[in-house]
Amino acid sequence: MGERGEVYSEKLFTESERTYFFNVKENRKGDYFLNIVESKRSPSGDFERHSIFVYEENINEFESNLLKAIAVIKQKVSTGSVGSSARHNKGYGEYGERSKLDDSRFDKKSHLSGGRFKKKDY
């Protein structure tokens, strides 16, 4: 069956109080997957975690698209076309939490009538 469980793990500590974990794991069937986790401290002192899983069958496409996205960021930074983080974080508070946006002009009944969309309270 192999090594089952965690095969590889790397932590990345940042100055913005975020920690990223890059984990390679093996499931019960012997398949490998990548688990990327972001952990950050919330204003209340708790930790908020966000996680994505990338499975073996998608790893090549994921790598290709991730490298393209990173190249765009690097190109934008090198040409100085990246603005202040405040502009890019619309709808987020000082600590990265979602802030309630003004939806007073939004017709909730017509948008929600299909039942597919639900109002989120942040």
UniProtKB/Swiss-Prot annotation:
Q: Reply yes or no: does the keyword Transferase apply.
A: no
Q: What induces it?
A: Highest expression occurs during conditions of slow bacterial growth and division (at protein level). Inhibits its own translation. Transcript levels are high in unfed I.scapularis larvae, decrease as the tick larvae feed on mice and rise again as the larvae become nymphs; mice that been infected for 1 month have no detectable transcript (they remain infected with bacteria). Transcription may be under control of DnaA.
Description of the deletion phenotype: Essential, it cannot be deleted.
- Keyword hit for NAD: no
- Name where the PUR repeat repeats lie: 3-76
Q: Where is this region: Disordered?
A: 77-122
- Domain of life of the source: Bacteria
Which terms does the record give in the GO molecular function aspect? purine-rich negative regulatory element binding; RNA binding; RNA polymerase II transcription regulatory region sequence-specific DNA binding
> How the protein assembles, per its UniProt entry?
Homodimer.
Recite the other comments: Both isoforms are expressed in vivo; the experiments here were performed with the shorter protein which is shown here.
In Swiss-Prot or TrEMBL terms, this protein is called: Transcriptional/translational repressor BpuR
